[in-house]
Amino acid sequence: MADEFSAGPDHRVGDHVAFTADVPHVYTRAQWNARPPRRPAKVLGRPPDHIVVHHTATANSSDRSLGHAFALSRSIQNFHMNGNGWDDTGQQLTISRGGIVMEGRNRSLKAVRAGDLAVGAQVLHHNGHTIGIENEGTYTNKRVPGRLWDSLVEVCVWLCQAYNLDPSQAIVGHRDYNSTACPGDVLYAQLPKLRRSVAARLNGSPSPGGVTGGQQMPAFPTFGDFG
């Protein structure tokens, strides 16, 4: 399709495109049928300095389909615009539990291509220097699905390359900036492994293994906890 954002080799898993190259296949807003934003996102002519990992704090769905992923993006946009009164989806990128990667905030993909930042609404007081990845699910005491984890690694590799970021410093969790349980204790505990996996890919080494379980904790945020 003409509006797909992809490069390098890819292969199909089920009804969506999976990726194994450093530039992932990202489904555009047009493909998941996004609403028009209230106004275009502000684009800064400079890169972000941090990649912020979130979780949606929604149900840990077993549906890995493309249709489910697109519905997820629409539900997030509706919640952010109707519930929070924001101009558009807060985060720049969204990954479903099936590992499907989608553009979130308008102008995000074009900005990444240019090495710029489309300012989102995903980290209170820190939106002007961060780019956010929303991961479907609640990871307070549940494992991260392998497909989601693999896509998260690939997306972080892509962003670190595009913005010349050091994963050991750049990849953080939402709770590192704001008072929140996001991205859940299990996913947050995996961030050191994520940094190592991304660094290994950037250095040309095989990515170390998949995700493992983590600690258990109670409270979790809602979509409105992005600030």
Predicted region positions:
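Glycan-recognition patch characteristic of GH18 chitinases/ENGases
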Residues: G67-G83, D88
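Basic/polar, cationic surfaces and motifs that engage anionic cell-wall
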Residues: M1-A59, A71, S96-G115, V119-G227
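Extended ligand-binding clefts on enzyme/binding-domain cores
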Residues: R64
